[in-house]
Amino acid sequence: MDTGIWKVYGPVPEDAFGFIYEIVNITNGKKYIGKKQMKRKIRRLPLKGKKRKRVDYKESDWKTYTGSSDALNIDIATQGLDKFVFKILKFCNSKFELSYFEAKEQFERDVLLSEDYYNGIINCRIGKPPKQLLEQYYNQ
């Protein structure tokens, strides 16, 4: 599978919804931790005679995505893509997993307290996990 600018260590799961990533500036060592959805929801008109809208998924721009940090994107524009390493740390199967593991990774690395990171905010809104995920977690 073509992964664009991203380095992947291991196979890309077919059912992956998104991933947690790290971008490293080779010149100064600064890093950025974030998440990206690989699929996006498309709402379509209902079929003739039906009332409910249809939901489809389409591949997002993840292969060329460079993060949402303004400071990071300015550095990428001025220094060039070749001065950065784009690594996928973990694949996730749901929005909940994506938000949870991004926040977990950011808190474990103290991204807001360190000058070594581009991250300026940990923006996360997480509810109760799906029962299926809890069962997986407790059965490991």
Question: Where in the sequence are the language-model features?
Answer:
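Structure-specific nucleic-acid interaction/processing domains
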Residues: 1-140
